């Protein structure tokens, strides 16, 4: 029985992780979990599974829940997340949090000797250098949940690092893949959230529409698989059937195919190196797909993808600033405070304005994150004046 600590249980990845756990009740249990403000979802979860520890965002929610569920230990806030991460009574941390808030729980779990199943992109985008050092120091493993990185992870099995020529990360192109730059000026939040292939959370769906998400995945792949940025390519693939590929030095290309269902990479992260049965609503049928298409990405059409390569290669505080500015700008667009293309302007301006600084400590990351957020807030005020 593998005991999980699930952070971000009420989100898209979190709820699908619970679905995987419920499909294999003899293999997995959940020792503890966290949710944000979705107390309604938490109560539904607690009807399905037994947990001993729960973290919520607000102290008032913690107190109310503690009275309703006396057999559960409740915590709240960032400190509560770190408390869960540090606990000894679990085997694998599943980090499904969204944003920079996911970094410190990952780091603390590693320092406590826990293996990580990672869906939180920002852990590696913002703090990849520190996480890389910690993983080596504490001898733990990191298993990717992102479908693209899971595909690469699977395609690498049985081969050696020196045999890899390049990684090919596929990209659907998001909600606006067929729109021109001119057409993007007036797109709505509702249009941006209508992803053609995947059912995801709101933030990542917007990040997919402007390809910031794919840029994050390039940086993640660099740290996950120790591959230089010049050997990581993005390939447009609108069908989302091939989730990513690995080209080897003999020019063989290994690809992982599957239905666009996140439960598949979630389960593989939980069960590696084994494979368990999985009930999917619609498994992949290649005869229905019939045709697959591929193209090179237009970096002028998707400038945030180019920016991610730039920030990743330079390193230091630039990825943290990029992420922070994007978190703020993405949220502002979803709140209808800025137009869609303003997200790009704000994030690009942040990275090109900040003074480069090396990142040696957690405080360096916190400072970079704060700078990026403050800059983005100022830019948003300028857009609205």
Residue ranges and their predicted role:
Residues 1-385:
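Catalytic, metal-anchored helix/loop core of enzyme active sites in primary metabolism
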């Amino acid at each position: 029985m593998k005991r999980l600590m699930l952070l971000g249980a009420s989100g898209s990845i979190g709820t699908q992780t619970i679905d995987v756990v419920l499909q294999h009740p003899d293999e997995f249990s959940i020792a503890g979990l966290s949710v944000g403000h979705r107390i309604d979802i938490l109560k539904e979860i607690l009807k399905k599974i037994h947990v001993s520890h729960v973290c919520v965002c607000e102290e008032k929610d913690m107190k109310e829940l503690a009275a309703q569920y006396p057999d559960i230990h409740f915590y709240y806030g960032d400190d509560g997340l770190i408390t869960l991460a540090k606990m000894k009574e679990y085997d694998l941390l599943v980090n499904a949090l969204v944003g920079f808030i996911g970094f410190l729980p990952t780091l603390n779990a590693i320092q406590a000797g826990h293996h990580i199943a990672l869906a939180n992109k920002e852990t590696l985008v913002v703090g990849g250098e520190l996480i890389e050092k910690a993983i080596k120091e504490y001898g733990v493993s990191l298993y990717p949940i992102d479908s693209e990185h899971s595909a690469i992870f699977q395609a690498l099995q049985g081969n050696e690092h020196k045999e890899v020529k390049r990684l090919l990360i596929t990209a659907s192109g998001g909600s606006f893949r067929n729109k021109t730059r001119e057409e993007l000026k007036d797109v709505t939040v509702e249009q941006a959230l209508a992803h053609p292939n995947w059912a995801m959370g709101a933030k990542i769906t917007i990040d997919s529409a402007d390809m910031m998400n794919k840029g994050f995945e390039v940086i993640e792949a660099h740290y996950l698989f120790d591959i230089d940025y010049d050997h990581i390519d993005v390939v447009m693939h609108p069908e989302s059937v091939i989730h990513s590929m690995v080209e080897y030095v003999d020019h063989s290309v290994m690809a992982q195919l599957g239905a666009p269902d996140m439960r598949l990479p979630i389960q593989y992260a939980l069960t590696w190196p084994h494979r368990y049965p999985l009930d999917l609503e619609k498994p992949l049928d290649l005869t229905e797909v019939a045709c697959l298409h591929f193209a090179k990405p237009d970096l002028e059409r998707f400038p945030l993808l180019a920016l991610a390569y730039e920030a990743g290669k330079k390193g230091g505080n630039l990825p943290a600033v990029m992420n922070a500015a994007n978190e703020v700008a993405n949220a502002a667009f979803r709140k209808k405070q800025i137009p869609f293309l303003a997200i790009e302007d704000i994030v690009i301006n942040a990275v090109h304005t900040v003074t480069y600084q090396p990142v040696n400590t957690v405080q360096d990351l916190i400072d970079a994150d704060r700078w990026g957020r403050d800059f983005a807030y100022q830019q948003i005020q300028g857009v609205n004046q």
